[in-house]
């Protein structure tokens, strides 16, 4: 399923879609950051600090470094909350193409 906005994400979760491609850069970057937090490669406290204090650059894999702003940190935090509520785990299949696999009930 191709994701263009947050409503598409809610729809994908409702329908338990297992593979998505995110066309929206902000949402795609938020997914990449959320994936780093879920995998223990980025402490969640970093998102909290960014939401309060500004921006930073984070390496998300495959040589891609993205600027993380307050807005992006807030979006990533919302995603992580939704993932926790539904016991969803994401797997980054391709960083540059923003392709993700979603596992439910893990």
Language model: regions and residue ranges:
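Acidic, low-complexity, intrinsically disordered interaction modules
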Residues: 58-64, 68, 72, 76
């Amino acid at each position: 399923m191709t994701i263009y906005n947050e409503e598409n994400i809610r729809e994908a979760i409702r329908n338990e879609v297992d593979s998505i491609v995110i066309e929206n850069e902000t949402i795609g970057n938020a997914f990449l950051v959320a994936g780093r937090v879920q995998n223990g490669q980025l402490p969640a406290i970093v998102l909290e600090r960014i939401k309060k204090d500004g921006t930073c650059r984070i390496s998300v894999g495959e040589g891609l470094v993205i600027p993380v702003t307050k807005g992006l940190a807030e979006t990533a935090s919302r995603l992580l909350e939704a993932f926790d509520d539904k016991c969803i785990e994401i797997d980054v299949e391709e960083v540059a193409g923003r392709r993700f696999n979603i596992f439910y009930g893990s």
